[in-house]
Amino acid sequence: MDNIPNLTILEHSRISPPPSTIGHRSLPLTFFDIAWLLFPPVHHLYFYHFPYSKSHFTETVIPNLKHSLSITLQHYFPFVGKLIVYPNPHDSTRKPEIRHVEGDSVALTFAETTLDFNDLSANHPRKCENFYPLVPPLGNAVKESDYVTLPVFSVQVTYFPNSGISIGLTNHHSLSDANTRFGFLKAWASVCETGEDQPFLKNGSPPVFDRVVVNPQLYENRLNQTRLGTFYQAPSLVGSSSDRVRATFVLARTHISGLKKQVLTQLPMLEYTSSFTVTCGYIWSCIVKSLVNMGEKKGEDELEQFIVSVGCRSRLDPPLPENYFGNCSAPCIVTIKNGVLKGENGFVMAAKLIGEGISKMVNKKGGILEYADRWYDGFKIPARKMGISGTPKLNFYDIDFGWGKAMKYEVVSIDYSASVSLSACKESAQDFEIGVCFPSMQMEAFGKIFNDGLESAIAS
């Protein structure tokens, strides 16, 4: 990392909670968490306007971020712990957990870059490889006698001279979902802005670590289906490709209303439609049509799949609080024929199937966990898979460390996860931001199809 072009490392730090505030603690993984054990790390980037000198950055910002992260970690101890996994498939007595021991620390790197802040924090197509120096590696897995340990969280703060700051976060997905990560960031930002944790504790919601979701059968099934023998692999940072670009597209309320109208005009009896389902359906159809535009020859009957995460906290019986720590979502997998998706009514059919899939999952008579043992069966179907990363319900643009709200939020890990990022827009939480990563020629085709379709939706 010290030899990355356009990047100068200013400081490598290890941040621990205040002494004796946590001690030895562990957090068992649930069946929700285990599903993510073999997935690659999650990379997020936040850009902030910061038109100040390097001396102000080093003398004020760096100490404040160090201190506030230390204070925050005592309330979110799993972020500073290590993932413990026992790869031996014949040993069923020891389960994966996140364990903290006194002295554990988070890697916090401070750097300076010559990259263009205004370019990276814009919406237009930008080279993917320019984002990779701004997100930190997670750290290496270490094989002990009969288990493997792995850091679960790392941070990099990068200074753009007299223009901005970026905060890059990397976490293992088994650590948390977006809800937990959002709570952690809100807490850290509050402590950084105020200098103490009392405002966060008074006005926020400290995490709930109780493992009240107990379903031994689901747990064992999920654990047995996870090939832990392959876990001992150093996680790799996002690879580079000079031809890939990332861009952000905005779906305004007027666009979303037009898309809903198109769906309901053709399917007036459709029981469930929402801003989320029409957005996902529209993105999915635009991506496939952009591939056709690029000359892709795919059979009409070949299958396409789209995966969305359905939040489960409020849908369990009894429901879990929003500040429950960890992962708590279920995959909703929708399948459609390529010929239908790329056809004239592809968007409408995609939105219909996504809505029906979500509705069927959340309205089961036996609760959302009914047939949970079949959640992942769809992944076995031979089909091209795409999915959504993120949710517009959490406004990450509201994260303010004392320099104002974020100028731009990017999910860098969509570059290798075949996903599209979806978040609330920085100008209005009722508008959506969509982040995509494609080869440059496909991005041009996607942009034209996307924008032309929106013009048609508004005009109809």
UniProtKB/Swiss-Prot annotation:
On the tree of life, the source organism's domain of life is Eukaryota
The active site consists of 173, 400
Molecular functions per Gene Ontology: anthocyanin 6''-O-malonyltransferase activity
Does Iron-sulfur show up as a keyword for this record? no
- What does the entry report on temperature? Stable below 45 degrees Celsius for 20 minutes at pH 7.0.
Q: Which InterPro entries match?
A: CAT-like_dom_sf, Plant_metabolite_acyltrans
Q: Gene3D superfamilies this protein is in?
A: Chloramphenicol acetyltransferase-like domain
pH-related activity info reads: Optimum pH is 8.5. Active over the pH range 5.5-11.0. Stable from pH 6.5 to 7.5 for 20 hours at 20 degrees Celsius.
Q: Which Pfam families match?
A: Transferase
Keyword annotations from UniProtKB, A to Z: Acyltransferase, Phenylpropanoid metabolism, Transferase
Q: Which reactions fall under this protein's catalytic activity?
A: an anthocyanidin 3-O-beta-D-glucoside + malonyl-CoA = an anthocyanidin 3-O-(6-O-malonyl-beta-D-glucoside) + CoA
EC number of the protein: 2.3.1.171
The keyword Transmembrane appears for this protein = no
Share an example GO biological-process annotation for this protein. phenylpropanoid metabolic process
How does its record describe regulation of its activity?
Answer: Completely inhibited by 5 mM N-ethylmaleimide or 0.1 mM Cu(2+). Partially inhibited by 0.1 mM Fe(2+) or 0.1 mM Hg(2+).
Enzyme class per UniProt: transferase
Record's function text: Catalyzes the transfer of the malonyl group from malonyl-CoA to pelargonidin 3-O-glucoside to produce pelargonidin 3-O-6''-O-malonylglucoside. Can also transfer the malonyl group from malonyl-CoA to cyanidin 3-O-glucoside, delphinidin 3-O-glucoside and quercetin 3-O-glucoside.
Similarity remark? Belongs to the plant acyltransferase family.
User: Could you tell me what this protein is called?
Assistant: Malonyl-coenzyme A:anthocyanin 3-O-glucoside-6''-O-malonyltransferase
State the organism of origin: Dahlia pinnata
